[in-house]
UniProtKB/Swiss-Prot annotation:
It comes from Methanococcus maripaludis (strain DSM 14266 / JCM 13030 / NBRC 101832 / S2 / LL). Pathway: Cofactor biosynthesis; pyridoxal 5'-phosphate biosynthesis. CDD domains: GATase1_PB. Belongs to the glutaminase PdxT/SNO family. InterPro entries: Class_I_gatase-like (IPR029062), PdxT/SNO (IPR002161), PdxT/SNO_CS (IPR021196). L-glutamine binds at G47, E48, S49, R102, I128, R129. The gene is pdxT. It comes from the Archaea. In the presence of PdxS, forms a dodecamer of heterodimers. Only shows activity in the heterodimer. Signal peptide: none annotated. This is Pyridoxal 5'-phosphate synthase subunit PdxT. GO terms for cellular component: cytosol; glutaminase complex. Catalyzes the hydrolysis of glutamine to glutamate and ammonia as part of the biosynthesis of pyridoxal 5'-phosphate. The resulting ammonia molecule is channeled to the active site of PdxS.
Amino acid sequence: MKIIGILGIQGDIEEHEDAVKKINCIPKRIRTVDDLEGIDALIIPGGESTTIGKLMVSYGFIDKIRNLKIPILGTCAGMVLLSKGTGKEQPLLEMLNVTIKRNAYGSQKDSFEKEIDLGGKKINAVFIRAPQVGEILSKDVEIISKDDENIVGIKEGNIMAISFHPELSDDGVIAYEYFLKNFVEKR
């Protein structure tokens, strides 16, 4: 079975662990850089991107994650952290050739659920202070999901990033299955 690490320093970690189990993989909570050893993929969860970024700097994760040669899934704040820029001063991994509009859908009270397409399947996406892709900076970035005309899912190389929270939706397992099939199992 594949071991999928979940960056466990802030955010909705337990929900991702439950979702990983549903796709018959083993979740491993990543609290230190040493925990990155032996994983087949990494999930960077939603949470507060500025806080997660500062903690990644404090715990020495930035360079370690940048140098990983494994698939990475970023959800919500994870998408923000993987981007090249947000227009705000904050620590970023800068692994995806996109800029991000933080909190593009508004505040917490503006959160919503909406059915969108991901890889040819419908998924009930949960958007909580969700980001959107602002600008695509490379032809290597592929759009995998949209909310109307807004880009909410992309992939580039071995990285997938979505602006919604699949771990909070009953059918969110679709996103994890997509990641497993198109990234983890192709490794």
